[in-house]
Curated annotation (Swiss-Prot):
Mostly expressed in the shoot apex and young flower, but also in young leaves, root tips and stamen, tissues where frequent cell division or meiosis may occur. SUPFAM superfamilies: BRCT domain, SMAD/FHA domain. GO terms for molecular function: damaged DNA binding. It is found in: Nucleus; Chromosome. Keywords: Cell cycle, Chromosome, DNA damage, DNA repair, Nucleus. The lineage of its organism: Eukaryota, Viridiplantae, Streptophyta, Embryophyta, Tracheophyta. InterPro entries: BRCT_dom_sf, FHA_dom, Nibrin-rel, Nibrin_C, SMAD_FHA_dom_sf. Residues 25-87 form the FHA domain. Component of the MRN complex composed of two heterodimers RAD50 and MRE11 associated with a single NBS1. It comes from Oryza sativa subsp. japonica (Rice). This is Nibrin homolog. The gene is NBS1. One of its GO terms (biological process) is DNA damage response.
């Protein structure tokens, strides 16, 4: 078990402390195990809480073992009081005096309101393992050091469930989930024993195991995350005997915030209330018999989930969309009264990729392929097709499925006008049969990429049997990748990019206009003028020096 020292009132600087191991713990203002900052009557080291040994929970009495082996020793100037009632002083301890404490006793440090209550926090562990297996001696020693009590019998007094990794899901574990008891691994108790004293219980998030159910691995989460994880969902159930852990199913759904209805009740209300249109109405199907409700028409619009996946969603704390099977819908046939059930996930949506869309109906027109000249033949009516069969011509049907597509002829003939198509005919027993043949690619117009417009009616169904890409690969022996090259593309190192300011790089247009010649003429003239000015300036210097020298010489000679 664990001892908790909890403040009775909201005291500044006081926190709840959990004692996980035997030892001596100091209480004071600063640098102590239990810090109390209320008034000046609290000494630096005011008192000591001595835990001689950790006692376990007694299953017979349903209380902690007696005695508790917890003492308080006063080390202060103003004293320590225990079981102090409002209006009374209680029992005061003088310096170095101690007293034995029990579950529920209160201790007041100093003359203020720093009152704490000593309470017992039981740790009763339900060991869920193999019947022949036992707890390892190392783990047993750790659990004894913190006062944990281990049992193999599940009861409401159990606080935790100890399991091994990848343990199978059992009804006892589901009972623990319903009772909101955390499922942990043995390492969690080792972490608790290492702390001695702490302000909170160690988190078990990293020490939650993985369980297995019918080969499926389930990552269990904390109990608080399981609560209300299925809120908003309504599950349609059959008899409880059909499901795995059926006796726990209703309670589990209620604990997760989900609702449930019986199949008969849902079918009775579906016609009036329109039930089944909500996406969160899910039919629960037994995993061992997935076709249990396949014959009930009113359940067709519902999504489905197996009981195994539902238990996995509850223990993991969330329901994934991939675990839900989408509903089936009914497609009514136009030629009969039968109805086809199509699963929503198998529906293929066709998107039109051209400007003209041909209605794909079962008509009397049929396209056939002649292997000799590789041309497509269009039979216009059923009568002509019958005549072809009677005459035993060499026209071969491409498949048996296409034979069934020939139906009664329409009143008007189909007229196809296309630039790249020509009409021809041949006689079978004296009757003309119109045939539309495609012109080979060599006989088409200039532009290969030109769009061909076909004037057609909805009664014509054209099926292209030969693909152009396949024919090209047979003729050339491989794909011609040059046909994908862009035409008219200019390289990045073109002359226009290197010399962007010249519009006509190969014609001396600037010289023809005379702009460059005038500029060079003016530049030459300017340089000549500068040269003349430079010469005049240089010639003027010696003359000035000579004139200055002669005048001085004259003055000197004149004085003599």
């Amino acid at each position: 078990m664990v001892w908790a020292l909890t403040p009775v009132d909201t005291v500044r600087g006081a926190q709840r402390c959990y004692i996980f191991a035997a030892g001596t713990y100091k209480v004071g203002r600063k640098d102590c195990d239990v810090i109390v900052q209320t008034d000046t009557s609290i000494s630096r080291v005011h008192a000591e809480i001595v835990v001689e040994k950790m006692v376990a929970w007694d299953p017979q009495s349903g209380a902690p073992a007696n005695p508790s082996y917890v003492r308080v020793v006063d080390r202060s100037k103003y004293g320590t009081f225990f079981n102090k009632v409002q209006g009374t002083q209680g029992s005061r301890l003088h310096k170095d005096e101690d007293a034995m404490l029990a579950d529920g006793d209160t201790v007041t440090f100093g003359t203020g309101n720093a009152t704490f209550r000593l309470s017992f926090v039981p740790i009763v562990v339900f060991f869920h393992g193999k019947k022949s297996g036992r707890i390892s001696p190392c783990l047993q020693a750790v659990m004894t050091s913190i006062g944990a009590y281990a049992t193999r019998k599940w009861s409401d007094e159990c606080t935790h469930v100890l399991v091994d990794e990848s343990c199978s899901l059992t009804p006892e574990l589901l009972d623990a989930v319903l009772a909101k008891k955390q499922i942990v691994l043995g390492d969690w108790f080792k972490v608790m024993a290492e702390k001695n004293i702490h302000t909170e219980m160690p988190s078990s998030t990293q020490y939650i195991p993985k369980l297995t159910l019918d080969g499926m691995e389930i990552q269990v989460v904390e109990i608080k995350l399981i609560e209300s994880c299925l809120a908003g969902y309504t599950f349609i159930l059959g008899s409880s005997e059909k499901y795995k852990f059926g006796d726990k199913l209703h309670a589990l759904l209620e604990s997760t915030g989900a609702k449930y209805l019986h199949v008969d009740e849902f079918c009775a209300n579906s016609q009036d209330s329109g039930a089944g249109e909500n996406d969160k109405d899910i039919l629960l199907v037994p995993a061992k018999s997935p076709l249990e409700f396949s014959k009930i028409r009113g359940l067709f619009p519902l999504s489905k989930i197996t009981d195994v996946k539902l238990f996995a969603a509850i223990l993991s704390g969330h329901l994934e969309a991939t675990a839900i099977e989408p509903p089936a819908y009914i497609v009514a046939s136009s030629n009969s009264t039968d109805e086809t059930i199509v699963v929503d996930s198998d529906v293929e949506i066709d998107t039109a990729t051209s400007d003209h869309t041909v209605a794909a109906s079962k008509s009397e027109h049929h396209i056939e392929h002649i292997s000799d000249d590789k041309k497509e033949v269009v039979a216009i009516s059923e009568e002509d097709a019958v005549n072809l069969v009677e005459a035993k011509t060499s026209i071969n049907l491409h498949s048996d499925q296409e034979k069934d597509e020939i139906v009664k002829p329409m009143e008007e003939d189909v007229k196809v006008i296309e630039k790249t198509a020509t009409m021809r005919g041949f006689k079978v027993e004296g009757e003309d049969i119109p045939v539309m043949t495609k012109v080979p690619k060599d006989e088409t117009l200039d532009s290969r990429d030109e769009t061909c417009h076909v004037i057609y009616t909805q009664n014509l169904v054209v099926k292209s049997i030969l693909q152009s890409a396949r024919a090209e690969s047979i003729e050339t022996g491989g794909i011609n990748f040059k046909r994908f090259r862009k035409r008219g593309a200019v390289s990045g190192n073109s002359f226009k990019d290197l010399i962007p300011y010249s519009r006509e790089p190969y014609r001396e247009s600037d010289y023809e206009r005379g702009t460059v010649t005038d500029f060079m003429r003016e530049e030459k003239k300017r340089r000549q003028m500068e040269a003349i000015a430079e010469d005049l300036f240089n010639n003027a210097k010696p003359k000035k020096k000579a004139a200055a020298g002669s005048s001085i010489h004259t003055m000197l000679t004149g004085r003599r």
